From Swiss-Prot:
Keyword terms, alphabetized: Cell membrane, Membrane, Transmembrane, Transmembrane helix
One GO location term (cellular component): plasma membrane
The name this protein goes by in its record: Uncharacterized protein HI_0275
InterPro entries listed in its UniProt record: Alkaline_phosphatase_core_sf (IPR017850), OpgB/LTA_synthase_biosynth (IPR050448), Sulfatase_N (IPR000917)
Protein topology in the membrane: Multi-pass membrane protein
GO BP terms in the entry: lipopolysaccharide core region biosynthetic process
Family annotation (Pfam families): Sulfatase (PF00884)
Gene Ontology MF: a single term: transferase activity
Predominant place of localization: membrane
Compartmental location: Cell membrane
Length: 551
């Protein structure tokens, strides 16, 4: 009797989810998805109660999983997220978010109940199997056919800025996205080519000496002075302020919030945003990178650079090593490879940024067997981790932070965050001083990969930007004698690699990088922020349809 009460409750919950859909197309896809799940279990088990229980409970699981992702990542659940879920190398992340860990454990328990509940009820025999197979095939065919309907596609795409709130629309519609296909943009490549060729050449900026290039992806980093505090006593942070060696500094458009660092890595290394790939955006390190034909690292290698990635996470985490290999890196190292006292299989969540800079110095000094015979200029790409959450919720208000409508726990989290950024500032200034002391040409770049929430609160920021929660900062410093002059006041992360090459006095080595640098000039550093939508579409058409940078 209790089991049937639960069955009724879960079924009612599933019906409520369907009734509360926000779009007409969601009703269709929610009903067909429910029928698909029901038919699949009925086809296998021939037990109608088990099939109803499976589909109803799974609807609840999917809705809760969707809300869990929005809670932590402020992004909707898409089918490509399951690339990350099924890769066990990523599971350690849950240990650092106890709320998420308990939530996932609860969802797994519900999933087990969905699969095994009512497994001892009477079978309908071959008739049940046949009806289930018919429902399964028909519902799948309907979802597959209508997932490419222009009206359905437009409704779905329009819903994504609102957190993609209808998960039962997101999942069927994003299923086609798990199969890689070249992005298709309506535009005119020839128009872009004409604008690109009309630009003046920067041949005078080219350097005969190729400097070492160090780039730091600063985890979860936004200059805390950008928060709109009514009162604060945060010390000056020199890494964000103009210095004698600062050659470029601007706000930076990133394409993720509160996590998914690999999306920012992708934009920087590939030179195109993950958003170009639609539903595959969450899985670009798995499903898109192998198809790329160009990018920053391949251009640097063509210039003779030896390229090294240094990560505090394991080589398998988020498929990093495989992705870096495809990008063109010669070597990926972890701090453990350079003497850090921890097993090579351990993700270093608490390693300080100062220690990461120490190992960066060791790479530049070639203190690793794989580097001993390297006589090329070096590109070192390093990721920090200490700035990552979670943050202390009981810390004193050390920096006297005040902001209306922000709770005590959020203020505590912001204090913890700020002290980590202060330590990061010391680490960045330390590596910058070291690079100067070497008396060799260098270019040092650093950028924040995304913003974060503080006890689930998102503090308002200074500045008048579209999507202000997706803006960090990018800074380049150098001792190179160069004629480089900053032209952009705002930069998309996809253009950061080209800016670094320009500062270093390096020419583009392929047509993609030439186009990337040209578009940066033509659009004043903007992509999705550009007011010239036709120029943007012409550029994208040139990249994907003419140059075929992804195949």
């Amino acid at each position: 009797m209790i089991a049937y009460i639960f069955l009724a409750l879960f079924t009612i919950a599933a019906v409520i989810f369907i009734v509360n859909s926000h779009y007409r197309w969601t009703y269709f896809f929610a009903i067909t998805l429910f029928t698909f799940l029901f038919g699949g279990m009925l086809m296998v088990s021939s037990q109608w109660q088990r099939a109803l229980n499976f589909s109803s409970v799974l609807f609840v699981v999917l809705m809760l999983f969707h809300r869990l992702k929005i809670h932590y990542y402020k992004q909707p659940l898409l089918i490509s997220d399951f690339f990350l879920v099924v890769d066990w190398r990523n599971w350690e992340t849950l240990i650092h978010y106890k709320g998420a860990l308990f939530g996932v454990i609860g969802l797994l328990a519900l999933l087990g109940y969905a699969i095994f509940g009512f497994n001892d009820v009477e079978s309908l025999g071959v008739l049940g199997n046949s009806i289930g197979a018919l429902l399964f095939i028909v519902s799948f065919s309907l979802m597959w056919h209508y997932s490419k309907n222009p009206s359905a596609v437009q409704v779905w795409l329009d819903s994504l800025p609102d957190d993609g709130r209808d998960v039962f629309l997101n999942l069927p519609m994003s299923c086609r996205g798990i199969f890689f296909k070249v992005p298709n943009f309506d535009g005119n490549s020839q128009n872009f080519i004409e604008k690109m060729t009309a630009l003046s050449s920067d041949a005078n900026n080219l350097s005969e000496t190729k400097p070492d290039i160090v780039v730091t992806l600063m985890e979860s980093t936004l200059n805390p002075h950008q928060f709109a505090f009514s009162q604060q006593s945060i010390p000056p942070l020199s890494m964000f302020e103009p210095q004698n060696d600062t050659v470029f500094a601007s706000p930076l458009r990133v394409h993720t919030f509160a996590g998914a660092t690999w999306k920012s890595e992708f934009a920087f290394l590939a030179g195109v945003p993950s958003t170009d790939f639609g539903a595959l955006a969450s899985g670009v390190f798995y499903s898109v990178v192998p198809h790329l034909q160009s990018g920053l690292v391949k251009n640097l290698k063509a210039q003779g650079y030896f390229c090294v990635a240094l990560s505090p996470f394991t080589k398998g985490n988020y498929n990093a090593k495989s992705a870096y290999d495809h990008f063109g890196f010669d070597l990926m190292l972890q701090p453990q490879d350079l003497g850090y006292p921890a097993p090579i299989s351990k993700n270093l969540w608490d390693i300080s940024s100062e220690e990461m800079m120490k190992y960066t110095r060791m790479i530049l000094e070639k203190q690793h067997p794989a580097l001993e015979n390297v006589d090329q200029p070096m590109f070192v790409y390093v990721l920090t981790m200490r700035e990552h959450g979670p943050y202390e919720l009981g810390m004193e208000n050390t920096f006297n932070l005040q902001m209306p409508n922000l709770g005590a726990k959020s203020i505590s989290a912001l204090n913890d965050y700020t002290q980590r950024i202060v330590a990061l500032n010391d680490a960045i200034e330390g590596i910058n001083n070291y690079l100067h002391e070497r008396k060799k040409p260098f270019v040092l770049g650093y950028f924040g990969d995304h913003q974060v929430a503080f006890d689930n609160a998102i503090p308002p920021k200074k500045g008048d930007y579209a999507q202000p929660d997706y803006v960090t900062q990018f800074v380049v410093r150098s001792n190179c004698a160069s004629q480089f002059k900053q032209e952009q006041k705002f930069l998309d992360l996809a253009f950061a690699g080209g800016v670094l090459m320009n500062v270093a006095g390096l020419s583009a080595e392929d047509e993609f990088m030439k186009a990337n640098m040209a578009m940066c000039k033509l659009s004043d550093g903007k992509l999705e922020d550009s007011s010239d939508i036709q120029l943007l579409n012409n550029y994208r058409h040139y990249l994907y349809q003419t140059l075929a940078i992804a195949r």
